[in-house]
Amino acid sequence: MLPSRTVKNKTINHPLNECDEFLKRCVHLTQPQQDLNCILDKTINGDFWQVCQFLPHQSMDLIIADPPYNLTKSFNGTVFSKKKDNEYEEYTRQWLNAVQPLLKETGSIYVCCDWESSLIIGRVLGEFFKVRNRITWQREKGRGAKANWKNGLEDIWFATKSDNYTFNLEAVKVRKKVIAPYRVDGKPKDWIETDKGKYRDTCPSNFWDDITIPFWSMAENTAHPTQKSEKLIAKLILASSCE
């Protein structure tokens, strides 16, 4: 039985005996696929290493990866121990090697990680892809530290398979209020005037402080400690795909 909670707590949390209904909706791959038609808009339930072998090569425009952070954690009675740096580096190399053939030559990949695993992931990512940038996502959630700075960020590495890739700049521009509007011949210069004020659409930077993490009062929130918000995923999809 799940612990009681307040009415405003919307965290998604299901007991194990209710999970079967959700698992029935998932796709279970047992053989290689010629295309993505049977798994489009569906969730695949299976072993990562086996599933990668069943997916067609060069079939994906975008990969958003959120690999396990190299931390010692207990999950549902199972304890995961932190690997040595060289072991985690080899693990990273193995899973990147598994997904690299699946990405189209025009495809992009984003890899989420914490500050510590980022030191390894960024380096190994460059062995398989062309690293374009490192996005820093400010996330105000987590405990403080008595003898260290509180960690309030996560890294998202952006890489592509080639120099020919999709990046929809207009779809992800950031609208900022203009404090000192500049005019030329009486007309706005690089800004727009609306009923709600004066704004400028600027190029997005690699520091994101405009996307909050899910909290207990939000309908998308889960108990996962490093959950990525729907808006974060949507921004990546808008930028690097045609969806």
Residue ranges and their predicted role:
Residues 1-243:
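Core catalytic lobe of class I
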